[in-house]
């Protein structure tokens, strides 16, 4: 039976049993679980190893790539600027990022970025993950392209570029990269061990992701020009990319 460390309120024993079962079956290599209830930390437990091919144990301070959970921290950063009166979500994006007002995007508002309705849910021009690491180039491409639908009229998940869109607005207002602003104004003041751009000094405590099985849904019937296809293929992101140093620094 898998060894579970930490604490678990008896009311959440079923959750502990699920974690044990997942580790025993191999459904999870390693994991941590925390639950807050009424402002109280009632579950804080972890177990397993940091990688399928590494027997090092998952520790209390092990961290892991959390994919789009980062969008929550990005939104929190933007809303902090709203709270300070520095950002108006109803203002055109061009108020803060003038170059964005091209090719029919003049009326795109900041709230369209935050709500996945801007019509710019991905890169129009072919891009690779390496291209996305180049902030100046990748945001410039977003500024020049036309929206894929009328901004504000529909929703389409901004899978890989929402951080670039909102992050560039944050940068134009503060002069700081999104990760720098988040660290200085949110993470460090509140003692939060969450990173947008991980320092190399922290690489040693990062767990390695195990790629999931291929998706069962087939989206080819939508056609190559469908916004969803263009979004998720430009660029195509694989789980193993999260183990790259460039990804961790981004």
List the model feature ranges, each with a label.
Residues 1-3, 40-42, 242-250:
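Terminal-appendage/accessory-domain detector
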């Amino acid at each position: 039976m898998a060894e579970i460390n930490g604490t678990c309120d008896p009311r959440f024993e079923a959750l502990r049993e699920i974690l044990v079962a997942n580790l025993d079956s191999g459904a999870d290599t390693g994991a941590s679980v925390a639950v807050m209830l009424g402002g109280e930390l009632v579950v804080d437990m972890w177990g397993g190893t940091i990688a399928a091919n590494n027997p090092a144990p998952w520790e209390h301070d092990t961290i892991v790539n959390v994919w789009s959970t980062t969008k929550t921290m990005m939104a929190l950063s933007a809303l902090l600027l709203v709270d300070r009166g520095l950002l108006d979500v109803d203002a055109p994006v061009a108020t803060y990022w003038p170059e964005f007002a091209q090719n029919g995007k003049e009326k795109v508002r900041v709230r369209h970025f935050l709500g996945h309705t801007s019509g710019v849910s991905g890169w129009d021009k072919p891009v690779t993950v390496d291209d996305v690491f180049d902030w100046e180039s990748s945001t410039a491409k977003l500024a020049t392209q036309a929206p894929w639908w009328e901004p504000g009229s529909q929703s389409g998940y901004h899978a890989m570029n929402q951080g670039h869109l909102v992050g560039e607005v944050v940068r134009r207002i503060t002069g700081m990269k999104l990760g720098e602003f988040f660290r200085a104004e949110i993470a460090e003041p509140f003692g939060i061990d969450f990173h947008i751009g991980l320092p190399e000094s922290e690489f040693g405590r990062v767990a390695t992701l195990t790629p999931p099985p291929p998706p069962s849904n087939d989206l080819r019937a939508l056609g190559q020009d469908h916004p969803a296809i263009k979004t998720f293929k430009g660029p195509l992101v694989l789980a193993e990319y999260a183990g790259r140093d460039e990804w961790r620094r981004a």
